[in-house]
A protein has these predicted regions:
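H/E-rich (His + Asp/Glu) clusters that bind or coordinate divalent metals
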Residues: 175-276
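Active-site gating/metal-coordination segments in enzymes
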Residues: 59-149, 156, 199-205, 212
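Short amphipathic alpha-helices and their capping/turn segments at secondary-structure boundaries
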Residues: 1-2, 90-100, 152-159, 184-194, ...
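Short, acidic/polar
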Residues: 31-42, 86-97, 184-185
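Hydrophobic faces of well-ordered beta-strands that scaffold small-molecule active sites
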Residues: 3-7, 50-53, 77-80, 103-107, ...
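Catalytic metal-binding/acid-base residues of hydrolase active sites
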Residues: 8, 56, 147, 172, ...
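Short, electropositive alpha-helical surface patch
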Residues: 60-75, 158-167, 220-227, 251-263
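An N-terminally biased module of ancient metal coordination in phosphate/nucleic-acid-related enzymes
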Residues: 1-60
């Protein structure tokens, strides 16, 4: 079984609203990227399950990803967004989990920390404790989209909410030039492996790389992540459905799988099967 833990799907008006959800996020889609387009992509490439992730440009209304997961319950689960600055976000999180069937949420510390360094630490805000406890009470999963410099927030949250499963999105964006410093800027991310409730998505390697396949300048840090977290806590994810992959400068799904199978040749067959 192959599971893609990270694909964005969306609709546009009049089917679903569009609009930014966070500071420094202003992109607006001009065309849809549907669940059906993703299903065709999955079927053509042997992918069994996908986690649908609400985009940052689809407002706080998670209806499309929630409905898609309920429409195709044997192929999808949904991760939603909830506003970390909304005083009613605990009730909102409960609604999306209890009434609409989403299994988790995505937060973007990188979009907030650029303004007020303290106020921007959304995973550490006392005002969000009830929301995170609400998600924890429901065995929710939370994925964190951020840079390595914000790893301290996840370190705090993973300790404070040990019953939440936390996922690191896109490896927290390691940069190949860090290799000259023995990858030391990435040490705070690797240190998160001390938390048994933190997992890491091995994804977006190609966009960080300055080299063509097999993206050799990124393979050492992938190895370090695998060694730190262990094969039981690494996940595989991609980004967009169908032709939207190349439109957003991502490789096709077949190439994503080739990276996982051929470029990551340091993984055993069993380890690779576990990641996928």
């Amino acid at each position: 079984m192959i599971v893609d833990t990270h694909v964005h799907v969306w609709e546009i008006p009049p089917i679903a609203p569009v609009g930014p959800t966070a500071p420094r996020q202003s992109g607006i889609p001009q065309e849809s990227a549907t669940a059906e387009l993703l299903l065709a992509d999955m079927d053509a490439n042997g992918v069994d399950w996908t986690v649908l992730v609400q985009t940052s440009f689809s407002t706080w209304d998670n209806g499309y990803v929630a409905d898609s997961a309920q429409k195709y319950p044997d192929r999808f689960v949904a991760h939603a967004l909830v506003d970390p600055l909304d005083p009613d976000n605990a009730q909102t999180a409960a609604y999306w989990m209890d009434e609409r069937g989403v299994v988790g949420f995505r937060f973007h510390p990188m979009y907030y920390a650029v303004d007020d360094p303290e106020e921007g630490k959304i995973l550490m805000r006392p005002e969000n404790e009830i929301m995170f406890e609400t998600i924890s009470d429901r065995d929710g999963i939370i994925q964190i989209h951020s840079f390595a410099e914000h790893a301290d927030q996840l370190d705090y949250a993973a300790t404070r909410y040990p019953n939440v499963t936390w996922l690191i999105d896109h490896m927290m964006y390691p940069q190949p030039e860090w290799a000259s410093d023995n990858w030391s800027p990435y040490d705070p991310v690797l240190a998160l492996s001390r938390h048994p409730n933190v997992y890491i998505k091995i994804s977006d390697v190609h966009n960080r790389s300055k080299q063509n396949f097999p993206h050799s300048d990124m393979l050492d840090i992938v190895k370090k992540a695998v060694e730190a977290f262990g094969v039981d806590r690494i996940l595989w994810g991609t980004g967009y459905p169908g032709y939207h992959r190349t439109k957003h400068n991502w490789p096709p799904l077949a190439e994503e799988l080739r990276i996982a199978v051929e470029a990551f040749d340091f993984l055993s067959d069993e380890e690779r099967d576990n990641m996928l």
